[in-house]
Amino acid sequence: MENKQLNLSEPENIMGTMDVNPLLIKLSIPMMISMLVQALYNVVDSIFVARVSENALTAVSLAFSLQNLMFAVGIGTGVGVNALLSKSLGEKNQYRANKTAENGLFLALCSYLVFLVLGLTVVRPYFYAQTADADIAEQGIRYLTICCVLSLGMFMQVMNEKLLAATSRTTLSMISQLVGAVVNIILDPIFIFGYCGEALSGTTGAALATVIGQFCGAGVSFYLNLRKNPDIQLDFKGFRPSAEAIKRIYVVGLPSIAMQCVGSVMTFLMNQILMAFTATAVAVFGVYFKLQSFVFMPIFGMNNGMVPIIGYNYGARKPDRVKKTIKCAMFYAEAIMLVGFLLFQFLPDKLLGLFSASEAMLAIGKPALRIICFHFLLAGMSIILSSTFQALGNGMFSLIISVCRQLVVLLPAAWLLSKTGNMNMVWWSFVIAELVSVTLSFVFFARLDKKIIEPMYDNAAAVQ
């Protein structure tokens, strides 16, 4: 049964035949737009919350570590599903493609149940471990509890969008993200500023607007998979989880989850380093993460277009197309990073002004943005290579790089530099860490090229 062949439709055919550069643009642009919209509504959340108070902004910033852990599980599982599904399509294996999709949705439900429990048990101690300010803690508790307890929409939205992206239907994935983002942006000011009552205002309102938007996006993306995606047939009658499919998903997905979890640990501990200076520094750090998402999210969107192309052509044994996809993606990533660098370098006051920055916040934030942005030019290459490792089924390389960058290098460097008593020195730890990251990325890619990509040339003629 597992050898049943897949009758590929036109979108799948073009992944193996269309010229790589226009193909990458065709698949990536919708995802880049949707990621930009995603970044926009994340920023809009903080812009509106900042108008409530700086404490509210700090509370949302402190919530980021646990919230990012939640996203890590959802996105990381989706990465595993995306890579395995696109590879199955390249191999023309219908049965495996269907089982991958069905088990991916099952894992999304399981992930939600885990964070439902965490939302009811660990949120309060999590906040009071970071701050003694009761106002900041209580605002953060209200925000994060809602985000965790009602996170089913987020997990389902992410998984369904990965299924659409893996089958090259990135425009449909973009539509579902746009729906969720637009709903969130509309509801943010309505809830946050108390138009639905004081009990639903402030950080509580921000959380409600977020989860409602996620449920809307989940509903749209699930419908699109059922009605507009003929290359996977979802049939849950008599569904039973497949240990084999889940194992294959997490062989790629677990390193991605762990890699993003490392980011949560880094953020949590960096907040502790910065809190020793002032709570305003934590708010600046939170604002930086919101702002840099405008730079990084388009690249992550391009990755969503790149990974299926690499996965498909890896399965189809077409090494030239794999290499050309990587080169094109890296060129575009560096171009995007250059634009981000220039904006952060020359307009930091304008960017911080979006968040109603006080004079104290501007004094800390302007040099922070100007220093941190130096790592952008290096990060573009690291991000593309990291996704390449995942697309080729070697996510462990991505994990090793992430751990080295954020735990082995960045945090110790930040801690040591904080001992100078000069907060500006702490921001240089990002640049130091990225230098290590990009070096490791190229070392690992050289190994991967030798072990996986080059041997494909032996079979390329027969496949083509």
Language-model segments: which ranges?
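Helix-terminus/linker motif at the lipid-water interface of multi-pass membrane proteins
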Residues: 36, 40-58, 127-134, 190-201, ...
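Interfacial/gating helices of multi-pass transporter permease domains
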Residues: 48-68, 135-139, 203-205, 245-252, ...
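Short alpha-helical transmembrane segments in multi-pass integral membrane proteins
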Residues: 1-28, 85-152, 198-254, 310-375, ...
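Residue-level signal for short hydrophobic patches within transmembrane helices
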Residues: 17, 21-40, 44, 66-73, ...
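Transmembrane helical elements of multi-pass membrane transporters/channels
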Residues: 26-45, 146, 157, 180, ...
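Short runs within selected transmembrane alpha-helices of multi-pass transporters and secretion channels
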Residues: 78, 147-165, 173-181, 206-221, ...
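Hydrophobic transmembrane alpha-helices of multi-pass small-molecule transporters
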Residues: 69-72, 116, 184-189, 218-222, ...
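Small-residue-rich hydrophobic transmembrane alpha-helices
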Residues: 57-117, 154-173, 284-342, 346-348, ...
